[in-house]
Amino acid sequence: METVVIVAIGVLATIFLASFAALVLVCRQRYCRPRDLLQRYDSKPIVDLIGAMETQSEPSELELDDVVITNPHIEAILENEDWIEDASGLMSHCIAILKICHTLTEKLVAMTMGSGAKMKTSASVSDIIVVAKRISPRVDDVVKSMYPPLDPKLLDARTTALLLSVSHLVLVTRNACHLTGGLDWIDQSLSAAEEHLEVLREAALASEPDKGLPGPEGFLQEQSAI
């Protein structure tokens, strides 16, 4: 009889431990996934393009298939449904800016790789490398600022810094690759990002304490003092 009881207790304990382990696994996948993606993003080396440009003597020898200017997990970060549960309404604008910057950067890299023979000098290539190195940390900063508690002013500052870095990459790429006509899509993309950035900027201003005219309570206090 005692053996049966011991076996039954053992079975129940095993079931309990298995259920607990499954619960921990589910909670980990549900709540820790965004940060896991961010950690992967942090651990990914900077762009293969930069390494290739620093080792190749001729830009035209670079292989476009080997170029990854941004982390391959950024798509998973942008498509993560956890961002949807946002009461502030700011996350959609942050996601839009990240997507625009990601797409712009990828296309600029492709244009750079396809214009190797048109490069002015090796100094132009170096300029692109320097500017490209600044983009990944900016993306990292924006993603980190998207986790609660949200700070509209921090979101505004970091998305602005990211957009400035991408705009700088546009300028140096245009100059280095002699890009002229048929590039309206670049200006349109930057304008679209600016519209989203304006929403974040307004939210940042709204989050600041009003230092202007006194409110009704202050006005009544002033009147009573008089």
From Swiss-Prot:
<dbReference type="GO" id="GO:0005783">
    <property type="term" value="C:endoplasmic reticulum"/>
</dbReference>
<dbReference type="GO" id="GO:0005886">
    <property type="term" value="C:plasma membrane"/>
</dbReference>
<dbReference type="GO" id="GO:0031642">
    <property type="term" value="P:negative regulation of myelination"/>
</dbReference>
<keyword id="KW-0964">Secreted</keyword>
<keyword id="KW-0812">Transmembrane</keyword>
<dbReference type="GO" id="GO:0045063">
    <property type="term" value="P:T-helper 1 cell differentiation"/>
</dbReference>
<comment type="function">
    <text>Functions as a negative regulator of MYRF in oligodendrocyte differentiation and myelination. Interacts with the C-terminal of MYRF inhibiting MYRF self-cleavage and N-fragment nuclear translocation. The secreted form promotes differentiation of T helper 1 cells (Th1).</text>
</comment>
<keyword id="KW-1003">Cell membrane</keyword>
<dbReference type="GO" id="GO:1900181">
    <property type="term" value="P:negative regulation of protein localization to nucleus"/>
</dbReference>
<keyword id="KW-1133">Transmembrane helix</keyword>
<feature type="region of interest" description="Disordered">
    <location>
        <begin position="207"/>
        <end position="226"/>
    </location>
</feature>
<feature type="transmembrane region" description="Helical">
    <location>
        <begin position="4"/>
        <end position="24"/>
    </location>
</feature>
<feature type="topological domain" description="Extracellular">
    <location>
        <begin position="25"/>
        <end position="226"/>
    </location>
</feature>
<feature type="region of interest" description="Required for interaction with MYRF">
    <location>
        <begin position="1"/>
        <end position="88"/>
    </location>
</feature>
<dbReference type="GO" id="GO:0005615">
    <property type="term" value="C:extracellular space"/>
</dbReference>
<comment type="similarity">
    <text>Belongs to the TMEM98 family.</text>
</comment>
<dbReference type="GO" id="GO:0010955">
    <property type="term" value="P:negative regulation of protein processing"/>
</dbReference>
<keyword id="KW-0256">Endoplasmic reticulum</keyword>
<dbReference type="GO" id="GO:0005789">
    <property type="term" value="C:endoplasmic reticulum membrane"/>
</dbReference>
<dbReference type="GO" id="GO:0070062">
    <property type="term" value="C:extracellular exosome"/>
</dbReference>
<feature type="topological domain" description="Cytoplasmic">
    <location>
        <begin position="1"/>
        <end position="3"/>
    </location>
</feature>
<dbReference type="GO" id="GO:0048715">
    <property type="term" value="P:negative regulation of oligodendrocyte differentiation"/>
</dbReference>
<comment type="subunit">
    <text>Interacts (via N-terminal region) with MYRF; the interaction inhibits MYRF self-cleavage.</text>
</comment>
<dbReference type="InterPro" id="IPR029668">
    <property type="entry name" value="TMEM98"/>
</dbReference>
<keyword id="KW-0472">Membrane</keyword>
<keyword id="KW-0225">Disease variant</keyword>
<protein>
    <recommendedName>
        <fullName>Transmembrane protein 98</fullName>
    </recommendedName>
</protein>
